[in-house]
C-alpha cells in the first residue's frame, strides 16, 4: 500500500472554468493528472487531496467533480481549501462522497499505512506581509482546528506514521519558524503535505525536512500535474 498526494485540482464545478487562463501549463490539466494517476495508483493505495478541489459554489454542483475523482483508483482523503465554497456542513459533504473517499474536518482517519489529519490553515504572519485583524482571527482559529485534528489522531493510539494535510503553507523557504511549525513540532508528525501556491509563488514553498518533520508542496502545477508519492520510511 502506497500513499500519494496532489492538491489544487480546481475542477470546473459545472461551470466553464478553463484553467489555461492561468497559463498554457494548465491545458487539459485534469486529463494529464488522471493519466498519471491511473499509471501509479492501485486500488489499495491512498491519495491525499489537500484542498481547492472544485470551483463549484454549491455542493450539488461539486458532485460530478467528486464522482470523477471517485472513479480513479485508490482511496481518497480530502481537505477543504479556500476556494471550496461548496464544502458546507461536513455531514452533508460526507453523505455525497463516493465510496472510498473521506473528508477530514476537525478529526483524523486511519489508513493502512498512516494516520491522516489536518486543517485548511490560513495566511501566515510573516515579515513580508502583515495580517489584518480578520486574518489574525481566522489564522488562530485554524491553528486551534489543527491542534484539534492532531489530538484526534493521537487518540487513535496507532503506531503508524502521522501525516498532516494543510491547504495553506505552514512555512516558507525563507521563513520556517512559524506558529504552525511550532505547533506541529509538539507532536510526532512524520510528514506535512500542503498546496495553495501556484506559478511564481511555487518558489516560495519549502520542500524538505525542518526540525524532524518532512514538508512537501503538492499543488498540482508544482508537481507538473503528476502525483507525488509520500515516503513513509523513518527519517
Segments and roles (model prediction):
Residues 14-19, 90-91, 128-129, 177, ...:
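Short aromatic-enriched loop/helix-cap "lid" or pocket-rim segments at secondary-structure transitions
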Residues 47, 162-164, 192:
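Receiver (REC) domain switch-region micro-motif
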Residues 77, 170-235:
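Conserved beta-sheet core of the metallophosphoesterase superfamily
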Residues 38-39, 154, 230-233:
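Short amphipathic alpha-helix with an adjacent loop that forms part of the alpha/beta core around
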Residues 15-111, 176-189, 211-219:
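Core catalytic region of metal-dependent phosphoesterases/phosphodiesterases
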Residues 1-4:
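Extreme N-terminal starter segment of soluble prokaryotic enzymes
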Residues 7-10, 51-54, 82-84, 107, ...:
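Active-site metal-binding loops of divalent metal-dependent hydrolases
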Residues 9-12, 87-175, 234-235:
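Conserved catalytic scaffold of divalent metal-dependent phosphoesterases
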Amino acid at each position: 500500500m502506497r500513499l500519494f498526494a496532489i492538491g489544487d485540482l480546481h475542477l470546473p464545478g459545472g461551470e466553464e472554468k478553463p484553467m489555461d487562463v492561468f497559463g498554457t501549463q494548465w491545458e487539459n490539466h485534469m486529463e494529464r493528472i488522471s493519466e498519471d494517476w491511473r499509471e501509479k495508483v492501485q486500488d489499495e493505495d491512498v491519495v491525499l487531496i489537500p484542498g481547492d478541489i472544485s470551483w463549484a459554489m454549491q455542493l450539488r454542483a461539486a458532485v460530478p467533480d467528486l464522482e470523477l475523482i471517485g472513479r480513479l483508483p485508490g482511496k481518497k482523503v480530502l481537505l477543504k481549501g479556500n476556494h471550496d465554497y461548496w464544502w458546507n456542513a461536513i455531514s452533508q459533504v460526507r453523505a455525497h462522497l463516493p465510496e472510498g473517499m473521506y473528508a477530514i474536518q476537525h478529526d483524523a482517519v486511519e489508513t493502512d499505512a498512516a494516520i491522516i489529519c489536518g486543517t485548511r490553515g490560513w495566511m501566515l504572519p510573516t515579515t513580508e506581509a502583515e495580517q489584518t485583524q480578520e486574518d489574525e482571527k481566522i489564522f488562530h482559529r485554524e491553528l486551534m482546528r489543527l491542534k484539534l485534528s492532531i489530538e484526534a489522531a493521537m487518540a487513535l493510539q496507532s503506531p503508524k506514521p502521522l501525516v498532516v494535510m494543510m491547504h495553506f503553507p505552514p512555512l516558507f523557504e525563507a521563513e520556517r519558524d512559524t506558529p504552525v511549525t511550532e505547533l506541529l513540532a509538539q507532536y510526532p508528525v512524520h510528514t506535512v503535505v500542503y498546496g495553495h501556491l501556484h506559478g511564481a509563488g511555487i518558489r516560495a514553498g519549502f520542500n524538505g525536512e525542518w526540525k524532524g518533520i518532512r514538508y512537501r508542496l503538492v499543488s498540482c502545477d508544482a508537481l507538473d500535474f503528476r502525483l507525488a508519492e509520500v515516503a513513509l520510511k523513518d527519517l
